[in-house]
Regions:
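Hydrophobic/aromatic-enriched cytosolic interaction surfaces used to assemble or bind macromolecules
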Residues: 1-370
Length: 370
């Protein structure tokens, strides 16, 4: 599954590095392809300190990210500066729409006109991209299901400026949701005869996708992430962010079997704080499932995959399975990818591996992908 927002290209070369700039972490990967096998040959990463970053201006934050990118690129010693990176968040709009049947070339030429009714911004303020899902017929007319992506020009411009200021050459701009889909696909997590739902629970938001028979049907961002869980603990327990983060990891969510714990118990108080955010997340997940099933009443969800930093929050998989009445499994984006020996110590535990799902999806891309 491919998508890109067109940006100027400087050189022609297929190999790219995947650059995942999240709200809390930066990850850069390089993947090599040989035969039917992918190998992770390079990985560098760094964190963006939350408490210090929240007290500085957007321009200062931008400088911090550029500086960290420069240091990571220097330490990685990669043989290309061409990148595939991704965007997400409030300045990125993802819509599932049905357009008149057109070729990709025709849609590229008319996308502004076709997209205008679906975009809550002025069409002149956004860059547009699309991913054609497949053909459908409505009232005897041939049409096509399409995932439409609009990014505010200012937001995209800043993203590109950051990459260039760090000495990189932005070549493909993707979205997190499609990178996640690519990551699932290469690891053989997308059956050709079933529908799966995947959640990438990052620091500030959750990417949700629903993939039917290997075809992406729904992609959206939910503005709930690991930091929301941490902040809920911080507020309830009256501690700083770092302490709240440790409490979150130590105790996790309360299971139905643990509901008898005394209310004054620290585990119960932390679990109660986490539960308030968790309920909001479940509500949004269920909304997406209901929307999908309303459009495809003959279908059902086969399985839910969890990835991202909060995929390993204690009991979140069991609780989600109980709430959604579906099997839930943690997705390891390296399960079908070889890892170079010098990288293995950094990804051998699942807590580290699940944070690479978007980066791996980006690293799979090659210049010239449709």
């Amino acid at each position: 599954m491919a998508f890109s927002i067109p940006i100027p290209k400087f050189f022609r070369s297929k190999e790219l590095i995947g650059v995942d700039i999240g709200s809390q972490n930066i990850r850069i990967v390089k993947l090599k392809h040989s035969g039917n096998k992918w190998t992770l040959v390079n990985l560098v990463k760094d964190t963006i300190p939350q408490e210090s970053i929240s007290s500085i201006s957007p321009e200062e934050r931008k400088s911090v990210i550029i500086d960290k990118l420069k240091k990571l690129i220097s330490s990685a010693r990669v043989d290309t500066k061409k990148t595939c990176s991704s965007i997400s968040g409030g300045s990125v709009i993802i819509r599932y729409v049905v357009f008149p049947k057109l070729s990709p070339q025709e849609l590229s030429q008319t996308i502004a006109y076709e997209a205008e009714p679906y975009i809550p911004f002025s069409i002149n303020e956004v860059n547009l991209g699309f991913h054609i899902v497949g053909d459908v017929e409505e009232e005897g007319q041939k049409k096509m299901e399409t995932i439409l992506v609009a990014s505010k020009k200012e937001f995209l411009r800043e993203h590109i400026e950051i990459l260039r200021a760090a000495g990189l050459q932005p070549t493909i701009i993707d979205i997190d949701a499609l990178a996640l889909s690519n990551s699932l696909e290469v690891n053989n997590y997308l059956p050709s005869d079933a529908t799966v739902l995947a959640l990438n629970i990052g620091a500030s938001l959750t990417n949700l996708i629903i993939v039917e028979n290997g075809i992406l049907k729904i992609a959206r961002d939910i503005f709930i992430g690991g930091n929301n869980f941490t902040q809920a603990v911080q507020q309830t327990m009256g501690v700083d962010f770092a302490t709240a983060e440790e409490m979150k990891k130590t105790y996790g969510l309360i299971t139905p079997q643990e509901k008898t714990i005394e209310a004054k118990d620290e585990k119960f108080r932390v679990g109660g704080a986490l539960a308030s955010v968790y309920r909001d997340l479940v509500f949004e997940i269920q909304r997406s499932i209901d929307y999908y099933l309303a459009r495809s009443p003959e279908k059902s969800i086969y399985k839910v995959y969890l990835t991202g930093g909060s995929a390993v929050l204690k009991n979140i998989d069991a609780n989600l399975s109980n709430e959604l009445h579906l099997p839930v499994e943690v997705f390891n984006p390296l399960s079908n990818i070889e890892v170079a020996p010098h990288i293995q110590p950094f990804v051998e535990n699942i807590e580290s591996a699940v944070q690479l799902s978007v980066a791996i999806g980006l690293g799979l891309r090659r210049e010239g992908d449709a």
